[in-house]
């Protein structure tokens, strides 16, 4: 917000940020899938209590990482939606002002 408490928004910046977040979420999903495959192979040959304990810890960590990825995706969508809304309102306001001003 500015010094006068006016909210200033640049929809193009919001769209760019949303695209970056979405890209990060997609990259994280790919990396998690690769890591999951590697850990799955490792756990496949690991027997005993330590293997079970690691497997349980891995599942917990993997679930948390998946929630982070989902959160990034949701945040990207929300920011993109808000940016589009601001752009729509800005365009509509400009049109109304042109009509009121006669041109």
UniProtKB/Swiss-Prot annotation:
Keywords: Secreted
GO cellular component entries: extracellular region
Signals that turn on the gene: Transcriptionally regulated by the sigma factor SigM.
Locations listed in the record: Secreted
Pfam families reported for this sequence: WXG100 (PF06013)
InterPro entries: ESAT-6-like_sf, T7SS_ESAT-6-like
UniProt similarity note: Belongs to the WXG100 family. CFP-10 subfamily.
Protein name as catalogued: ESAT-6-like protein EsxF
Originating species: Mycobacterium tuberculosis (strain CDC 1551 / Oshkosh)
